[in-house]
Amino acid sequence: MHTQWSESQAQAWYQQHDWACGFNYLPRSAVNWTEMWQADTFDAATIDQELSWAHDYGYNALRTNLPFIVWEADRDGLLKRIDTFLTLAEKHQIQVMLTLMDDCAFSGDEPYLGPQKPPRHGVHNSQAAASPGRAIVMDPSQWPRIEAYIRDVLTQFKNDSRITIWDLYNEPGNRGINLSPTESTEYDEALESFALDLMIATFGWARDVGPSQPLTVGAWHIDYQHYGTLEHPIDIAALNLSDIISYHNYNNAARQLGVLESLAQRNRPVLCTEWLARHMDCGFSEQLPLFCAFDTGCYQWGLVQGKTQTWIPWTSVNKDHPAPQSLWFHDVLTPEGKPFCKQEMQLVKGLTHYRQYRR
């Protein structure tokens, strides 16, 4: 079995890649990743168009998730569509981070095949589907199915230079469910302990395959019950097991700076794989220069305004903010490819150009 990369291996890998200025990606035509990747709704033309826009505005990286349910039902077809997607990203000079699992079932449904429900009016990411699904995560007798999926996808693409890094598991233990524009609830708290064990097992399966790309799982508990920042057991394990450190933070620049300074002590490259919450003072003008100064790759949430409705704020923000509709929460481009804010896109292009010549 392969082992965790050394600090020097991780740093050497990082120096071989441009500073990542990217986004979390679903095309505007997909309400969730199941719809994005199923054969009947895989929209290569829209993906091609949107990645062209992203390149033109200066982006060079993206992060996207894969659905276990589609692999299990249509393994060969999914692998071909992944190859098509990677070809399109390479065409537009965009590095790809693939995420294999995800607990963010904000719809409240277990994942299902076929036509997906339409977005619910006014609700942020209303049909988000997990991978493989919270019920399977909480049933270890089903984990051999997950292991087969992890091993197969990694084996198929373990030497593919179009993939720069694997994110094995997005937000393990996330229990959120969005009920309405201003109301949410949570799934069974027991999910967290199962997700922790599954994440640790997944690192083992992935190391056994031994991909040429590094492995990561993002620490994500910034403000969470009685745990300190990134001190939930899931975060501690993720930070200790990852080849490249990654994390999520939707807070203001002062909080972002504190996290960056803390993670720098680990002597590994750092990626912020989720950020951007304009209503919460997590915006471009302060934070993108901060990521650039720390040489921390960053992936904001969302590219084009679409069926995920992630320009609409989280339920908590909708409930408490005095003017929640005054800003977009996530996302940067209209469905016609025009920027929500021209200055944001000027900053993306300027900083990626600046960093390109300083590695």
Please give the residue ranges for each predicted region.
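Active-site mouth of glycoside hydrolases
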Residues: M1-S242, H248, A253-R255, R266, ...
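Short, acidic, metal-binding catalytic loop of nucleotide-sugar glycosyltransferases
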Residues: L290
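Short active-site alpha-helical segment characteristic of glycosyltransferases
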Residues: Q287
